[in-house]
Amino acid sequence: MPKTKKAKDEKSAKKDKKHIAGDEKGLDFARAWVEFPDPADDEQVFRCDLTWLTSRWNCIFGSGCQGIQAGRADDGCCSLGAHFSDEDDEKRVAGHVARLTPDIWQHHAEGTRNGWTSEDDEGSRQTRPFQGSCIFQNRPGFAGGAGCSLHILALKEGREPLETKPDVCWQLPVRRTYEWIDRPDDTRVLQVSIGEYDRRGWGPGGHDLHWWCTSATSAHGAGDPVYVSYRPELVELMGKAGYDRLVELCEERLASQLPLLAPHPADPAGR
């Protein structure tokens, strides 16, 4: 169906609202996706963004991160608190919160006295924002270390941070989505997509973020690609068998003749 002038005007208006910070690249560019059966589940397939997973992104919190809110770079992406994915997520986190102590959680007294959860305007439960950021966020200068106290707890106990932090926190900036696919032979498979959590992943408000790292050149200088540096998180999201197959495909891509097909635009030139 041909697009009407009204539809085009509305689309243009929406585009005008998009905010891209100084060192960020645009959201729309060629990507190399690969689809493969889940080795551990015949009724499931993975669809993975190799452009993202072989990119050289890395977290630069505390070393160049500009933060999602202007003037609050020290908060990183923790300014709004974290929404729980479900009741199990909240219960899991609560078990680890119980082990936090004042020496590693700056707001321990406030959190234990007045609570560490809250509800947003729509009634969804989340970690409580306190003084402009997540209540678990230790501010610069705190003796126990700046940053997420749940992350600090995990490192102190020799755990992976994905064990102690809310789902959304440890998954960022990898995004997992699900879609049932109806095939021509009347069968169905669950398609699990693993890709980049860009500004759009936040919903309409994502375009209003002060800065976002996945498309920023300053956050694309890691020695290892994402599929290597995020191994624990990807294994948790995909299972060991699925991750192992992903590694094979990523290695095949990187071993191919340069330049790569559809490289991430924020990566260093020459890849």
UniProtKB/Swiss-Prot annotation:
<feature type="region of interest" description="Disordered">
    <location>
        <begin position="1"/>
        <end position="21"/>
    </location>
</feature>
<comment type="similarity">
    <text>Belongs to the Rv0495c family.</text>
</comment>
<feature type="region of interest" description="Disordered">
    <location>
        <begin position="109"/>
        <end position="130"/>
    </location>
</feature>
<comment type="function">
    <text>Essential for maintaining intracellular redox homeostasis.</text>
</comment>
<protein>
    <recommendedName>
        <fullName>Probable redox regulatory protein SCO3349</fullName>
    </recommendedName>
</protein>
<feature type="compositionally biased region" description="Basic and acidic residues">
    <location>
        <begin position="7"/>
        <end position="21"/>
    </location>
</feature>
